[in-house]
Amino acid sequence: MPQLDKLTYFSQFFWLCLLFFTFYILLFNNNNGILGISRILKLRNQLLSHRGGEIRSKDPKNLEDILRKGFSTGLSYMYSSLSEVSQWCKTVDYLGKRRKITLISDFGEISGSRGMERQILYLISKSSYNTSSSRITCWKNIMLTHVLHGQGSIIS
């Protein structure tokens, strides 16, 4: 914007006022503007302060219902995932038998404490050992091992 001179002073002042008044009308005098948002926030705070006692009295039961629904949803999701993985393992095993190769034959879970790690690893290696002449392209068993005491993890 050039410096204000006597020839363009009026037009610059006119456009400056027009822009500022337009922004003022859009921001402050409209219900969706800044003043409208502040009115909505004040009303919301008043409603929450009046209903605060009711919400607190119903909170434990609602919280228990929410937790129960969340746990049941998580449990059903876990079981559906487990059934899908088991179905996938069966399908892969069936396809492997048709092609005369061993791919995946089992999906299981072993739970134990940290003291049982060596025994679990021995059982996994013993069950996945194959003496036949067919080539093994993947582990025979896929096992999820959970260590109860949380001191370490076993991945197989």
UniProtKB/Swiss-Prot annotation:
Q: Does the UniProt entry include the keyword Transmembrane?
A: yes
Q: Which GO terms describe its molecular function?
A: ATP binding
Instruction: Name the chemical reaction catalysed here.
Output: ATP + H2O + 4 H(+)(in) = ADP + phosphate + 5 H(+)(out)
Q: Which GO terms describe its biological process?
A: ATP biosynthetic process; proton transmembrane transport
Q: Which cysteines are joined by disulfide bonds?
A: none
- Respond yes or no to whether keyword Iron is given for this record: no
- Where in the cell does this protein reside? Mitochondrion membrane
Per the record, what is one GO cellular component?
Answer: mitochondrial membrane
Q: What is its EC number?
A: 7.1.2.2
| Membrane-spanning residues | 8-28
Q: Taxonomically, which superkingdom? A: Eukaryota
Q: Which InterPro entries match?
A: YMF19, YMF19-like, YMF19-like_N
Chief localization: mitochondrion
Membrane topology term reads: Single-pass membrane protein
Keyword line: ATP synthesis, ATP-binding, CF(0), Hydrogen ion transport, Ion transport, Membrane, Mitochondrion, Nucleotide-binding, Translocase, Transmembrane, Transmembrane helix, Transport
Tell me the protein family, please.
Answer: Belongs to the ATPase protein YMF19 family.
Function description? This is one of the chains of the nonenzymatic component (CF(0) subunit) of the mitochondrial ATPase complex.
Question: What quaternary structure, including any partners, is listed in this protein's UniProt entry?
Answer: F-type ATPases have 2 components, CF(1) - the catalytic core - and CF(0) - the membrane proton channel. CF(1) has five subunits: alpha(3), beta(3), gamma(1), delta(1), epsilon(1). CF(0) has three main subunits: a, b and c.
The name this protein goes by in its record: Putative ATP synthase protein YMF19
Source organism per UniProt? Triticum aestivum
